[in-house]
Amino acid sequence: MEAIKVLKKKVPGFETSKLRNFSMTLGIRDSRKIVGKYNLTGDDVCKQGRFDDSVGVFPEFVDGYAILMLPTTGRYFQVPYGCLVPDVDNLLVAGRCVSGDVLSHAATRNMMCCTVTGQAAGVAAAISIKQGQTTQNVDIKRVQEELVRQGARI
């Protein structure tokens, strides 16, 4: 990387420096998140959290804040519907802004988990309309049945 070469050459004290880590340490990939009915935690991610309102599963994969856990163990956590539901009628959130703490965000901000939450939000929205319910009061069992029918693992 050119920046490292320049630092070594031009900045006193950097002559023998080495790059050990980068953006994942700084946390610059963090983003705004909602405050949902449930706030997913790092413990949920790392200790295989299970939820009655699960709308999908995701492998134990954390990439950020100087932590790297690759999905090679077969371990997974469930994504609860509550982390998609803010305190606003008929609004669902999917992707990197679901409700969660800093560590859980390092697991849920990637594209695979965005797909899981996006499918769940779409199914829940459609069912809430059919049932004449708000997304906050949708029949979660019906949502789960439809997700399974579509081939999702919950």
Outline where the language-model segments fall.
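Flavin (FAD/FMN)-binding glycine-rich loop and adjacent Rossmann-like elements that form
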Residues: 1-154
